Amino acid sequence: MTSSSSWVKTDGETPQDQVFINFRGVELRKNFVSHLEKGLKRKGINAFIDTDEEMGQELSVLLERIEGSRIALAIFSPRYTESKWCLKELAKMKERTEQKELVVIPIFYKVQPVTVKELKGDFGDKFRELVKSTDKKTKKEWKEALQYVPFLTGIVLDEKSDEDEVINIIIRKVKEILNRRSEGPPSKCSALPPQRHQKRHETFWGIELRIKQLEEKLRFGSDETTRTIGVVGMPGIGKTTLATMLYEKWNDRFLRHVLIRDIHEASEEDGLNYLATKFLQGLLKVENANIESVQAAHEAYKDQLLETKVLVILDNVSNKDQVDALLGERNWIKKGSKILITTSDKSLMIQSLVNDTYEVPPLSDKDAIKHFIRYAFDGNEGAAPGPGQGNFPKLSKDFVHYTKGNPLALQMLGKELLGKDESHWGLKLNALDQHHNSPPGQSICKMLQRVWEGSYKALSQKEKDALLDIACFRSQDENYVASLLDSDGPSNILEDLVNKFMINIYAGKVDMHDTLYMLSKELGREATATDRKGRHRLWHHHTIIAVLDKNKGGSNIRSIFLDLSDITRKWCFYRHAFAMMRDLRYLKIYSTHCPQECESDIKLNFPEGLLLPLNEVRYLHWLKFPLKEVPQDFNPGNLVDLKLPYSEIERVWEDNKDAPKLKWVNLNHSKKLNTLAGLGKAQNLQELNLEGCTALKEMHVDMENMKFLVFLNLRGCTSLKSLPEIQLISLKTLILSGCSKFKTFQVISDKLEALYLDGTAIKELPCDIGRLQRLVMLNMKGCKKLKRLPDSLGQLKALEELILSGCSKLNEFPETWGNMSRLEILLLDETAIKDMPKILSVRRLCLNKNEKISRLPDLLNKFSQLQWLHLKYCKNLTHVPQLPPNLQYLNVHGCSSLKTVAKPLVCSIPMKHVNSSFIFTNCNELEQAAKEEIVVYAERKCHLLASALKRCDESCVPEILFCTSFPGCEMPSWFSHDAIGSMVEFELPPHWNHNRLSGIALCVVVSFKNCKSHANLIVKFSCEQNNGEGSSSSITWKVGSLIEQDNQEETVESDHVFIGYTNCLDFIKLVKGQGGPKCAPTKASLEFSVRTGTGGEATLEVLKSGFSFVFEPEENRVPSPRNDDVKGKVKINKTPSANGCFKDQAKGNESPKGQWQTYIENSSTNIPSEAHSSQKTGFNGFNGMYSVCVLYEMYSH
């Protein structure tokens, strides 16, 4: 059949410069395609149109035309899938596109791209009807073509579109592609995005959520809102990937759109004018848009640009000038346009530049593992590490943790590890952890340098120096690091590096990403500079020893960090080993193995003395400094921090030297130090640590010049007797602990917040102590000569903690202190005070080992804030009055005269969830009525805890919520399951677990038989169940512990009862998830044992044991099992509880109205013969001395 196709050709064009148009003729030939053909002809573009589609044009001719074309326009319209011809052409176009011989531009004429790709609606129905008469192979080819071609960058023409404008856009795009193909490969800053058939940008897990968040900020749903969003984040975090994928998703919705990649590098290589030219060419699809003035160019094209909304992506912007060069004054941007700017410098995202900022977060652990596995196992999810695959799962997590969710770092590590065995993975991980100990050139960080190299190169030389210095002081306080860096003048260097994501500041600490830290240390080893100033940072001990031994140190060395734990022998150096290091700023000689370097030998020695003619040193830290003083030629003019712990110095330096920048001095345990005269001119000193300087007898009066001193530590200065009459106007913390000869204290600062006088020889406090209105903590523990406290101490309105433990001669506590409204902690153990102080604000009160107290105040229940009350070994205490409602901890262990307790024991029990522990162990004079009251309280507490837990989130941690203990040998009557001995076995009816179990009350009676021990009392719990099919499942966990350390060994003289309540949430979850027969009874057992603090079995006998299930309140409870449903061999315990609130299961009687509504199950029990597992559950009740353990088993018939 002859062809009647129409051709348009202009002189000078080759037949290859042609466009093939694929369309549905009966629908578009006489309107849209006709207008498009004329437009192409006017621009001199060859176009091929099959004018005889309905007549059956020879297919081979059409396919030849496609093969001879450079561009194909695939125009999808509502009736497109009626034509086999259209689909055959489309399949050929797909083939040529995959061969990269053809560029296809999809045009969606009154259909949406998703309709075409997913064959929706009438469009899809027509296709399915058409392919009924075709073979499977052809159907597959056509369907793949329909799914493939619409995925390319296309143009949408809907009912509201201006047809002429769309045709002009098509023509401009065709011309631009033809020009680009004739010029060869595009430059890296090409304004046009890569075609979709080319390799797609690397993506990562979790990007869909980030795209959604970014879309919300851009407000794509609002046609009238112009939004400019800045995308920021550290290098490698995925900014470019995110921007590219968003562009690919949305560009076909905009008639004008452009993405400019790597603007920083492009502007460096080609200049801003060239960049602006490419930008306008991409946006306007015009040739030779010469840019001499950026603003003039925008004005020249303003009317044309304002015709339609634009989508603009500016990737990797490094300064504002780049944005201004491309966007100008922005008066050419139509409402509804969307602009995205990605950068690694947060400081660029000022309000005038963007509407909002999106900081790309790191990958979650889950997504990071998936991303890492993609590269470490070459995308083979089946090869991903899992159970039974050696140590790969753990190693994978370690690598992910190291990268902290950085996608590019994960990708590079994964590629490095691809195909390697487990031992190689281990070596690589160890290299990452130990990189600073490896010799230069052997570090793995070369592989990761690509993540940061672009951002690092963009830094100024000052910023690079600062970054490499910060790596030396990682995780240090922000103010400290800023002082070291800025000692030569004011600077915002830290803020600048934070904005560029090179460092971060969290909780006041300066830190950086692990991969950058590793790179920084490597660069510090290799760094050089043209000005020949110090740039080298030495870390490896071999290198440092060689430099010192051979006197190779020069002005190129900036810092030395020598770890003495790496050195195995003593070294002797010449006196001028450091003399040539004129630009040395940081010198640290330390030990990671032991901060005190306990070895008696000094490893670095200078037998001829030492020259330190250094002027630039900011930081001098020398553990076990071997000389009597810092050399006279050392200039501390720039010194910020001086640390000489465990040194041989007798004085800091000769005479007073100007040290205007010195803020921190630490000379701790320099036992020969006898004077501080040399520090008289360190007027900006903030902290002075002289702990353990045992030869120091006095402090100089010129310390008063230290106007900024806030911290002074004199702990263990055993020769110090007093302080001079000075005023340190800024001092907040003064430590005189262990100054055993210190007899007289006087106030040297009105701003003190913490004062430590413990272990001193003072007899009294000065009357003007009331001046310390900011004092929060006063510690006078072990001041054995202290006899009285001044009334003025009661004027300390800010005091929160007062420690008087061990002040054995102190027998009075001033009554005038009742108005100390902020005092929370009051420790009076081992004093001679006769009456408990009446300070209602106290939360923790300790009166342990006080033999003068016989009674507590009757108004103790008014101490509403009191939570911890310690009364151990108060041997004359006879009565415990009613306790306050919020008390969580009461310990009267060893109160040998205690006989009675108040009834009720607690004035009211709060309905909120409050853990509590009441310990009455070794109170052998306790009367029976007191024991019964303790039991009644325990029962009520279990009720209220069950009710409170109903209102709690089930995510709370399984734990012991209540425990108590007292001398006795009888099991309380309200425990429904009990037995003689250590094991209780029982059988529960089918569906028993539908009773909304809330917890378990536990009880055990233990015989101690004069046992001595320091063991801890803890409870663990274990459960095992059978699923009815021959297999079983189990859980094991530590329910909780209330452990108190006590170093006093004593004899326990009687049997004791322990009662506890646990929520055992994991057990409840297991019960609810049983997979066994639905109507089978459940057998279970509990086994109690006593363990020592080391976990071993104690030689103690469990006399009796028991428990009760505690269910949720009555109104929410499913009917519980009756007594006759519970099988057992032990007598049924039907003794009613003290308040008569329990339901008799056999008779089904309800609880009396108005009584406690929580239900404690009352049933018979079964004595077991054996146990199948050894899991422990526990509760504390015996002064932290023994471990009572419970073994729980459950299985189904």
UniProtKB/Swiss-Prot annotation:
<dbReference type="Pfam" id="PF07725">
    <property type="entry name" value="LRR_3"/>
</dbReference>
<keyword id="KW-0217">Developmental protein</keyword>
<feature type="repeat" description="LRR 2">
    <location>
        <begin position="638"/>
        <end position="659"/>
    </location>
</feature>
<dbReference type="GO" id="GO:0043531">
    <property type="term" value="F:ADP binding"/>
</dbReference>
<dbReference type="InterPro" id="IPR000157">
    <property type="entry name" value="TIR_dom"/>
</dbReference>
<keyword id="KW-0067">ATP-binding</keyword>
<feature type="domain" description="NB-ARC">
    <location>
        <begin position="210"/>
        <end position="480"/>
    </location>
</feature>
<dbReference type="Pfam" id="PF23598">
    <property type="entry name" value="LRR_14"/>
</dbReference>
<feature type="repeat" description="LRR 10">
    <location>
        <begin position="863"/>
        <end position="889"/>
    </location>
</feature>
<dbReference type="InterPro" id="IPR032675">
    <property type="entry name" value="LRR_dom_sf"/>
</dbReference>
<feature type="domain" description="TIR">
    <location>
        <begin position="15"/>
        <end position="178"/>
    </location>
</feature>
<feature type="repeat" description="LRR 1">
    <location>
        <begin position="614"/>
        <end position="636"/>
    </location>
</feature>
<dbReference type="InterPro" id="IPR002182">
    <property type="entry name" value="NB-ARC"/>
</dbReference>
<protein>
    <recommendedName>
        <fullName>Disease resistance-like protein CSA1</fullName>
        <ecNumber>3.2.2.6</ecNumber>
    </recommendedName>
</protein>
<dbReference type="InterPro" id="IPR044974">
    <property type="entry name" value="Disease_R_plants"/>
</dbReference>
<feature type="repeat" description="LRR 4">
    <location>
        <begin position="728"/>
        <end position="749"/>
    </location>
</feature>
<dbReference type="GO" id="GO:0005524">
    <property type="term" value="F:ATP binding"/>
</dbReference>
<keyword id="KW-0547">Nucleotide-binding</keyword>
<feature type="repeat" description="LRR 8">
    <location>
        <begin position="820"/>
        <end position="843"/>
    </location>
</feature>
<dbReference type="InterPro" id="IPR045344">
    <property type="entry name" value="C-JID"/>
</dbReference>
<feature type="repeat" description="LRR 9">
    <location>
        <begin position="845"/>
        <end position="862"/>
    </location>
</feature>
<feature type="active site">
    <location>
        <position position="89"/>
    </location>
</feature>
<feature type="repeat" description="LRR 6">
    <location>
        <begin position="776"/>
        <end position="796"/>
    </location>
</feature>
<keyword id="KW-0433">Leucine-rich repeat</keyword>
<dbReference type="InterPro" id="IPR027417">
    <property type="entry name" value="P-loop_NTPase"/>
</dbReference>
<dbReference type="Pfam" id="PF00931">
    <property type="entry name" value="NB-ARC"/>
</dbReference>
<dbReference type="GO" id="GO:0061809">
    <property type="term" value="F:NAD+ nucleosidase activity, cyclic ADP-ribose generating"/>
</dbReference>
<dbReference type="GO" id="GO:0009416">
    <property type="term" value="P:response to light stimulus"/>
</dbReference>
<keyword id="KW-0520">NAD</keyword>
<keyword id="KW-0378">Hydrolase</keyword>
<feature type="repeat" description="LRR 7">
    <location>
        <begin position="797"/>
        <end position="819"/>
    </location>
</feature>
<dbReference type="Pfam" id="PF20160">
    <property type="entry name" value="C-JID"/>
</dbReference>
<dbReference type="InterPro" id="IPR055414">
    <property type="entry name" value="LRR_R13L4/SHOC2-like"/>
</dbReference>
<feature type="repeat" description="LRR 3">
    <location>
        <begin position="694"/>
        <end position="716"/>
    </location>
</feature>
<keyword id="KW-0611">Plant defense</keyword>
<comment type="function">
    <text>TIR-NB-LRR receptor-like protein that functions in photomorphogenic development. May function downstream of phytochrome B (phyB) signaling.</text>
</comment>
<dbReference type="GO" id="GO:0010114">
    <property type="term" value="P:response to red light"/>
</dbReference>
<dbReference type="InterPro" id="IPR035897">
    <property type="entry name" value="Toll_tir_struct_dom_sf"/>
</dbReference>
<dbReference type="GO" id="GO:0007165">
    <property type="term" value="P:signal transduction"/>
</dbReference>
<feature type="repeat" description="LRR 5">
    <location>
        <begin position="750"/>
        <end position="774"/>
    </location>
</feature>
<dbReference type="Pfam" id="PF01582">
    <property type="entry name" value="TIR"/>
</dbReference>
<dbReference type="InterPro" id="IPR011713">
    <property type="entry name" value="Leu-rich_rpt_3"/>
</dbReference>
